[in-house]
């Protein structure tokens, strides 16, 4: 997933909003790479935010803030031209939670979403339908060769 993000954003500035990043491994790979990463924002549950803070401690200059997921409000996030990055957790987030995160898209703070999630939505939120409503069909979409049923999709304006 890192390799795909790296190839896609190449020579542009990446202002990531990591939603549900968990262990912090992907964010650390991006923050320590040759990608021009600025103003990274982390939105997650408290124990994961602590882990992400520790893992990315040496990259504090590239980090804007850490936000507790349960209290999230789009007005807490400043900026434009941001990219939401999510791996594995969109389907698990309740629809109301997704709406609050996707408010960042609605108010033009986020221009792109990079998603690596499964599409089996039985018992899960239909995050993909919401993304298509905001962006239309993804500019890139393919099934993972490593994880059957998981798709990498890039939506952007």
Predicted regions and their residues:
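S-adenosyl-L-methionine
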Residues: 54-79
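Conserved beta-strand signature within the Rossmann-like core of class I S-adenosyl-L-methionine
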Residues: 109-121
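Conserved alpha-helix/loop element of class I SAM-dependent methyltransferases that forms part
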Residues: 1-13
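A short, conserved alpha-helix within the catalytic core of class I
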Residues: 92-105
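Conserved class I S-adenosyl-L-methionine
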Residues: 12-22
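Core SAM-dependent methyltransferase catalytic element
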Residues: 140-157
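Conserved SAM-binding loop of SAM-dependent methyltransferases across substrates and taxa
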Residues: 23-36
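Class I SAM-dependent methyltransferase SAM/SAH-binding core
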Residues: 37-62
């Amino acid at each position: 997933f890192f390799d795909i993000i790296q190839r896609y954003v190449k020579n542009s500035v990446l202002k990531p909003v990591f939603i549900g990043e968990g262990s912090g491994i992907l964010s650390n790979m991006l923050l320590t790479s040759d990608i021009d990463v600025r103003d990274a924002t982390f939105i997650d549950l408290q124990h994961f935010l602590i882990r992400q803070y520790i893992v990315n401690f040496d990259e504090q200059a590239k980090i804007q803030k850490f936000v507790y997921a349960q209290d999230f409000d789009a007005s807490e996030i400043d900026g434009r031209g941001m990219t939401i990055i999510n791996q594995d957790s969109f389907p698990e987030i309740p629809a109301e939670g997704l709406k609050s995160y996707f408010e960042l898209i609605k108010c033009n703070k986020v221009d792109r979403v990079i998603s690596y999630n499964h599409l089996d939505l039985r018992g899960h939120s239909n995050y993909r339908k919401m993304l298509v409503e905001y962006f239309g069909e993804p500019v890139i979409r393919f099934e993972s060769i490593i994880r059957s049923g998981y798709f990498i999709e890039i939506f952007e304006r």
